[in-house]
Amino acid sequence: MTQETKNSILIIGGGLVGLSIAYEFSRNNFKVLVLSKNRNESAGFVAAGMLATHAEGLENELLKFGQASQNLIPKWIKSIEQDSNIKCGLKKCGIVVPFKNKEDLEEFPTYKYEDI
């Protein structure tokens, strides 16, 4: 195997996940090729800007993992902005989850995880 193929990566799909993977490999000196059928078919055109693991119905360890991952995003976005000289537009603005009554609130999966 030649040096060129040893450090080459092919990624199928140019959505948010595919491009994120490509970015990380590229930062680590891999030659990256992304193949994408149609860019506007990716999930990024639907909800890529929504970072709300606490509103996804996750519980216990999966919720904690999601929250920890979400907390890494600002630093990651900053590295993308520095590498590209393009602002990504990340804004922390919260989320509103309305409830009809206190019982519904208490049944919400993240209600009992106030320390997260």
What are these regions (language model features)?
Residues 26-46:
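Glycine-rich FAD pyrophosphate-binding loop
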Residues 2-17, 33:
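Beta1/beta-strand and adjacent pyrophosphate-binding region of the FAD-binding site
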Residues 1, 40-43, 87-89:
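Short secondary-structure boundary/capping segments
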Residues 13, 36, 99:
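Short beta-strand/turn micro-motifs composed of small residues
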Residues 18, 41, 60:
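Flexible, glycine-rich phosphate/dinucleotide-binding loops
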Residues 50-116:
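Dinucleotide-binding Rossmann-like beta1-alpha1 core, especially the glycine-rich loop
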